[in-house]
């Protein structure tokens, strides 16, 4: 099975670095690029053939950016992260959107894997202890 290609395009830098640190530990994922300019996300997603684009939550909730990115790269799953790390959102075509209530590293990786491998599926978080 091929690796899930992840493009990091989120701010602040500390959040991007934290996400990168989690992804590089995943045997089935690879970081294929990092971009700081939201205007360059579309070009970078096309150039890297990313499966996942990680954006800041403000960018992921920007209808123009998301709709344009999904129109040009329909295979892409968008992961939007809040800068303070307590909210995450996964967006795909068809339209499909899932808020992750507990955005721990394990839950984010599980959600990304399912979103990429089963596009549009209803992902369920594990029950709280």
Report each predicted region and the residues it spans.
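Internal alpha/beta domain cores that form substrate/cofactor-binding pockets in large enzymes
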Residues: 2-124
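A conserved mid-domain beta-alpha-beta active-site/ligand-binding segment of alpha/beta enzyme cores
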Residues: 129
């Amino acid at each position: 099975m091929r690796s899930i290609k992840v493009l990091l395009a989120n701010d602040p830098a500390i959040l991007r670095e934290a996400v990168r640190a989690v992804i590089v530990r995943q045997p089935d994922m690879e970081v294929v690029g990092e971009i700081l300019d939201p205007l360059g996300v579309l070009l970078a997603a096309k150039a890297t053939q990313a499966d996942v684009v990680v954006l800041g939550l403000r960018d992921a909730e920007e209808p123009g950016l998301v709709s344009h990115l999904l129109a040009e790269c329909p295979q892409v799953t968008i992961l939007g992260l809040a800068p303070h790390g307590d909210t995450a959102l996964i967006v795909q075509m068809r339209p499909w959107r899932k808020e992750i209530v507990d955005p721990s590293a394990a839950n984010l990786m599980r959600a990304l894997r399912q979103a990429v491998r089963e596009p549009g599926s209803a992902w369920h978080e594990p029950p709280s202890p």
